[in-house]
């Protein structure tokens, strides 16, 4: 089975919502069906992304403007080296986090999430064909995170996750597909697979 035009799919959600697992699992499901697909994550594994991960782990501090600039630089590399070449080669691209994460996580009283989205759009970054948002109560997400790893990242507190969830609700476009993150991972993967196939079945040959 081939796709006439590859699809760019983005997964968003607060930490602990299950989006990373979903991104990988859906890629596997599509590949099993003979639909060429690849998944990536932001921040990337390039030097620009490694720099950001140091910030996320609390190893370095960045002013808000520096954070935004760093994410924009990494996103340019993500598109140039990962996303666009894969789409051009005929593969669907499934991406764990994109510009909406930057707007939700890096916004504050001195920089609104809407302004961060505008900064991304001015860069002419590619708009996803499908945007999934895993919605989950921050308290449940935090409990999941506490069971998963010892070292917290700087945004993994209840107050921060509540702020981030609120910011997401402000900036996600109306066509965003919202998924209940309380559901089991297998159920969520199946739901997203059906949505993918239903929306783009006309493009299958």
UniProtKB/Swiss-Prot annotation:
PROSITE patterns named in the record: THYMIDYLATE_KINASE
Catalytic activity: dTMP + ATP = dTDP + ADP
Residues binding ATP, per UniProt: 13-20
Gene Ontology biological process: dTDP biosynthetic process; dTTP biosynthetic process; dUDP biosynthetic process
Keyword set, alphabetical order: ATP-binding, Kinase, Nucleotide biosynthesis, Nucleotide-binding, Transferase
InterPro entries in alphabetical order: P-loop_NTPase, Thymidylate_kin-like_dom, Thymidylate_kin_CS, Thymidylate_kinase
GO molecular function, one term: ATP binding
Main enzyme class: transferase
Gene Ontology CC: one annotated term: cytosol
Source superkingdom: Bacteria
EC number: 2.7.4.9
PANTHER family: THYMIDYLATE KINASE, UMP-CMP KINASE 2, MITOCHONDRIAL
Family note: Belongs to the thymidylate kinase family.
General function of this protein: Phosphorylation of dTMP to form dTDP in both de novo and salvage pathways of dTTP synthesis.
Protein's name in the database: Thymidylate kinase
Species annotation: Leptospira borgpetersenii serovar Hardjo-bovis (strain JB197)
Record lineage: Bacteria, Pseudomonadati, Spirochaetota, Spirochaetia, Leptospirales
UniProt gene name: tmk
């Amino acid at each position: 089975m081939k796709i006439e035009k590859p699809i760019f799919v983005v997964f968003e959600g607060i930490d602990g919502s299950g989006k990373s697992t979903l991104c990988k699992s859906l890629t596997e499901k599509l590949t099993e069906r003979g639909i060429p697909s690849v998944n990536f994550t932001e921040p990337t594994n390039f030097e620009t992304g490694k720099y950001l991960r140091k910030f996320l782990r609390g190893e370095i501090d960045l002013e808000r403007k520096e954070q935004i600039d760093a994410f924009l630089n990494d996103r340019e590399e993500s598109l140039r080296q990962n996303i666009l070449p894969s789409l051009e080669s005929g593969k669907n691209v499934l991406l764990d986090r994109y510009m909406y994460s930057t707007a939700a996580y890096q916004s504050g009283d001195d920089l609104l999430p809407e302004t961060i989205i505008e900064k991304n759009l001015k860069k002419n970054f590619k708009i996803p064909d499908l945007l999934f948002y895993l919605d989950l109560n921050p308290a449940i997400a935090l409990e999941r995170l506490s069971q998963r790893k010892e070292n917290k990242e700087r945004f993994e507190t209840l107050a921060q996750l509540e702020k981030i969830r609120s910011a997401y609700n402000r900036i996600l476009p109306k066509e965003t597909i919202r998924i209940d993150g309380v559901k089991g991972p297998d159920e969520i993967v199946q739901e997203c697979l059906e949505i993918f196939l239903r929306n783009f079945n006309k493009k299958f040959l």
